[in-house]
Amino acid sequence: MSRRILGIDPGSLITGFGVIDVVGNQRHYVASGAIRTKSGSPLAERVKVLVDGIHQVIDTYRPTEAALERVFVNVNPAATLMLGQARGACMTALVLKDLPVAEYTALQVKQSVVGQGKAPKEQVQYMVVRMLNLSGTPQADAADALAVALTHANHSGGAIGKLALRGLKVRGGRLV
């Protein structure tokens, strides 16, 4: 059975997307790119650009499920808030199209794709290229989104992945 996964790396200015097909244990590249918003635009306009852009990706590539990177808290509270709003817009766009959504932290993505949680972005990009047999390196935000999609492909086949699609987590063998 084939699955098509849309991975999203949310950003307040650039939101990356990556689409892969999963057939058995094979992962195949479908598409990737970025949705860009204008930095000086009002928040409502930027949210609309994100929702419309994600809907266009969904309508074009018809994914069966989606994965989204979780927001990290950084030293700048305003930047964290903006990133959270962009992420909320992405989540809204996905659920409005009735896609099941799983969430992964940056640490989980790096561990899944590279094997260690403190891997630099360049190493993540390198592994995305290798895992999907790409001829070139995608733009950074698109590569991150492909890494999120690959992480979901790696985690979603078993029981834990099915729980993640329902928004549930397992830690230390316990449902949290």
Curated annotation (Swiss-Prot):
Q: Catalytic center at which residues?
A: 9, 69, 141
Name a GO molecular-function annotation. magnesium ion binding
- Cofactor-binding details, from the entry: Binds 2 Mg(2+) ion per subunit.
User: GO CC terms on record?
Assistant: cytoplasm; Holliday junction resolvase complex
Q: Name one Pfam family in it.
A: RuvC
Q: Which reaction does it catalyse?
A: Endonucleolytic cleavage at a junction such as a reciprocal single-stranded crossover between two homologous DNA duplexes (Holliday junction)
> Where is it mostly found?
cytoplasm
Give compartment(s). Answer: Cytoplasm
Binding residues for Mg(2+) 2: 69
**Keywords for this entry?**
Cytoplasm, DNA damage, DNA recombination, DNA repair, DNA-binding, Endonuclease, Hydrolase, Magnesium, Metal-binding, Nuclease
GO biological process entries: DNA recombination; DNA repair
Q: Identify the EC number(s).
A: 3.1.21.10
**Listed InterPro entries:** RNaseH-like_sf, RNaseH_sf, X-over_junc_endoDNase_Mg_BS, X-over_junc_endoDNase_RuvC
- Entry binding sites for Mg(2+) 1: 9, 141
Q: Which cofactor does it need?
A: Mg(2+)
Q: Entry's CDD domains?
A: RuvC
What is said about its interaction partners and assembly?
Answer: Homodimer which binds Holliday junction (HJ) DNA. The HJ becomes 2-fold symmetrical on binding to RuvC with unstacked arms; it has a different conformation from HJ DNA in complex with RuvA. In the full resolvosome a probable DNA-RuvA(4)-RuvB(12)-RuvC(2) complex forms which resolves the HJ.
Query: Record's NCBIfam families?
Result: ruvC
Q: Which family does it belong to?
A: Belongs to the RuvC family.
Summarize the protein's role: The RuvA-RuvB-RuvC complex processes Holliday junction (HJ) DNA during genetic recombination and DNA repair. Endonuclease that resolves HJ intermediates. Cleaves cruciform DNA by making single-stranded nicks across the HJ at symmetrical positions within the homologous arms, yielding a 5'-phosphate and a 3'-hydroxyl group; requires a central core of homology in the junction. The consensus cleavage sequence is 5'-(A/T)TT(C/G)-3'. Cleavage occurs on the 3'-side of the TT dinucleotide at the point of strand exchange.
Put simply, this protein is called Crossover junction endodeoxyribonuclease RuvC
User: What is the native source organism of this protein?
Assistant: Chromobacterium violaceum (strain ATCC 12472 / DSM 30191 / JCM 1249 / CCUG 213 / NBRC 12614 / NCIMB 9131 / NCTC 9757 / MK)
